[in-house]
Amino acid sequence: MRDRKYYEIRETKVPAMIIELLSHQNFTDMKYGLDPAFRFNVARAAYKGVLRFLARRYNTQYAVQPLPVRRFGIHALGKSRYSLSWAPTPDPLEPSAFSKYYIVQERIEGGAFRDIAVVNEPAYELAVADERIHSYRILAGNDGGLSFPSEVLALRDNGSGIPQVNIVNGFTRISAPDTFEEGDFSGFNYSSDAGVPDVADIISTGVQTDYRRQSDYINDDAPGYGASRGNVEKTITAGNTHDFVYLHGDALRAAGYGFVSESSEAFASDVTLKPIGSAANPPVVDLILGKQKEILPGTGTKGTRYKAFPEALRQRIEAYCNQGGSLLVSGAYIATDLLDNPHSDELTRSADRSFATDVLGFDWQLGKGTVDGKVSMVPSPFKPFGWQERFSFTVSPTPDSYAVESPDAIRPSTPTGATIMRYDENGLSAGVAYTRPIATSTSRYADSRVVSMGFPFETIRGAKARNRLMADIMHFLLPHR
């Protein structure tokens, strides 16, 4: 730190500050600079600094705006009534950032969000009198302002008041691209994983082309180590919109099903074993995992984040399936994160393997199953999946959908499972259906059923393909439920 009389802030007529951050744009700098979570933390720190300075200058009280709420969930109460619940997120660095009230916002179908309620407690009840998709998000507020919106959850009432599906959003990751460091070479591995923007981003010029640490700057045409392409300058790249429940729900609505939704944190924290098929515990869970995977952000000093199946979620899913609940899980790293995870210790690796093979019914085959994103349904012992139609999913970044650079190839782990789809490029198994007998006498169902996809459902191109696939998956998961 240097204490100097900098002209830029000494002569201004308004409060000002100078921030020197990421000024060298070296490899370590850019590990943070390309991370949306880090950029949010920096922006919030600057906001806090300006706020405190002004409060002290004018001898007044201040409050920092709250962080977005967490543990958001929508649950059916029966007779077309629903409850929304959530939890405030404390800021450990700022006691004034607590929530004093909450704004509940609603969106009907593909319209715009509007305020429908202001409440003082983290809960709200409502009635739905139609069969449209109703989406909700929460804003926390205090004297300092409003938080960023929560993730977007949704519901659809099909007239019975008892939803058949609980859509669980486990895709929370926002991050920089994959990195590697091997001898004299290091950089960002966009072909492995180009990262996940927060909603959307415009920060990248293109993939890195020069990985040699000793490569010197010669001129602007040969800038040396870290040089990158310029083909995506000014291009908006889609990321984690935190709004994929609607897309899954739209496919369920097309098949005639009602649904509720909740965050994976809310789902994992509910350890009460409510009867499967009741309004409070739908018989099918649709788990969205997107590009969720365990990563080591920045220089790794703060540990890992974004594990696809953390212990609490793993245990909750196992308990749910042991009751006779059925599961659809889709994501690019559902097998890699469990069975080929470099961040797992031996104990975690053993528990993850048992969960994947015994509960979900698949084994890891390859971490980059395809590069063209083309998939075909194939014949299997399970009747709903006999059609041999082809579809594709997004493998290159676009303004409309995030890219899946490394989809998993997965194979059945038991004789009661079967491959139901394959990648056209090489014939590797892309999806597995699985039936598992229920041993407990308390279950009203004879088996638990699981469909696992090695790529995210929401990245499938075209509503027609998504609707057809979802209808057949639900026909398999709900034959007698």
Report each predicted region and the residues it spans:
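Active-site-adjacent mobile loop/cap segments within catalytic or ligand-binding domains
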Residues: 1-60, 454
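Beta-strand-rich modules
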Residues: 125-146
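Aromatic-Pro/Gly-enriched surface loop or interdomain linker
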Residues: 152-283, 457, 471, 475-481
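Short alpha-beta junction capping motif
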Residues: 160-171, 178-190, 276-344, 444, ...
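Short beta-strand segments within Ig-like beta-sandwich modules, predominantly Fibronectin type-III
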Residues: 114-121
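Short, surface-exposed beta-strand/loop micro-motifs that present aromatic residues
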Residues: 5-10, 407-410, 428-446
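Pro/Thr/Ser/Gly-rich low-complexity, intrinsically disordered linker/stalk tracts
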Residues: 53-96, 144-163
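A glycine-rich, often tryptophan-bearing local segment used as a flexible ligand/cofactor-contacting loop or short
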Residues: 292-406, 415-417
